A protein has these predicted regions:
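Rossmann-fold NAD(P) dinucleotide-binding segment
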Residues: 55-67, 71-118
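NAD(P)+-binding Rossmann beta1-loop-alpha1 motif at the extreme N-terminus of oxidoreductases
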Residues: 1-66
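Hydrophobic beta-strand scaffold residues
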Residues: 31, 51, 118-120, 161, ...
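Helical "substrate-binding/catalytic lid" subdomain
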Residues: 169-290
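Rossmann-fold dinucleotide-binding core
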Residues: 7, 99-178
Length: 290
């Protein structure tokens, strides 16, 4: 890792702020952040993170990390009239830490290369608590030399760093990860409803499931920490965001000629949860519509 690197970070939301904090405190590098909200910038200033008033102030960055809500936001920040493509120097690397369409990742790679700027998709998985602890799983799509340059920085935010292949492959794997997670949470919601209806203590049931072949990350986290407690905060991965990611998965399924009926069922349940007013709630709230 080059100790003279300048790092930019755009997007300080639920995951972005703790990732930015870890990157700053662990790397010792000069780090400048951009967000439309004042509060996270003020908090991060306490650990030495500078603030950019506009994207133009990212011009001196050697690496720029993005943690944005969706592909449209990523496209705007990268390719807009005052976007990164207009300000970054040759040799800079742009890294998308969020979940965006595979096709967009490959388009951005092509567009940035016209300006001798490199691009990598490196979407993160796990929870906000993992972002705070620096124990995220990060799935990287990049050519080998770009991955090698980024890996030391990524290890300051995550503990499991997987080079999935070329640009776009990180997004593809992350989208499949989320599709499987959403279907698992939906299955847990069904089990919870059936168990309650049949008169069993849900806590006893989930504890027993965790000791058998039904054990999973989703059971131990989304199931035990949210669904059992019937607690679905607004400062977590919302139903709206889950619906967005599931849409990316179904788009990929259509591209390869697969119906993906399980994912379609979960999409309908997310739609029901959103219609019931749970759009901003932590997505395991889907249990309330089953």
């Amino acid at each position: 890792m080059n100790k003279q690197q300048n790092i930019g970070f755009i997007g300080l939301g639920v995951m972005g702020e703790p990732m930015c904090r870890n990157l700053s405190t662990k790397s010792g590098l000069k780090l400048t952040a951009f967000d439309r909200r004042e509060e996270p910038l003020t908090r991060l200033a306490q650990v030495g993170v500078g603030r950019a008033a506009s994207l133009a102030e990212m011009a001196a960055s050697d690496v720029v990390f993005l943690s944005l809500p969706d592909g449209e936001a990523v496209r705007d920040v990268c390719l807009g009239n005052t976007g990164l493509i207009a300000v970054l120097n040759a040799g800079a690397i742009v890294v998308d830490l969020g979940t965006s369409p595979v096709a967009l990742a490959r388009e951005l790679d092509s567009r940035f290369r016209e300006h001798d700027v490199l691009f990598s998709d490196a979407p993160v998985a796990r929870t906000r608590a993992a972002a705070e602890a620096g124990t995220l799983s990060i799935m990287v799509g990049a050519e080998s030399r770009v991955f090698n340059a980024l890996e030391p920085l990524l290890r300051m935010m995550g503990e499991e760093i997987t080079h999935c292949g070329g640009v776009g492959s990180g997004q593809l794997v992350k989208i499949m990860n989320n599709m499987v997670l959403f279907q698992t949470v939906s299955a847990l919601a069904e089990a919870l409803a059936i168990g309650r209806g049949a008169g069993i203590d849900p806590a006893v049931m989930f504890s027993a499931l965790s000791k058998g072949s039904a054990d999973s990350f989703a059971l131990r986290n989304h199931g035990m920490k949210a669904m059992l407690l019937d607690t679905f905060p607004h400062d977590a991965f919302s139903t709206t965001y889950a619906m967005k990611d599931l849409g990316y998965a179904l788009e990929l399924a259509r591209d390869v000629g697969l119906e993906a009926s399980g994912a379609q069922l979960v999409q309908e349940r997310f739609r029901q949860a959103i219609d019931a007013g749970f759009h901003d709630s932590y997505f395991p709230v889907v249990t309330r519509v089953i």
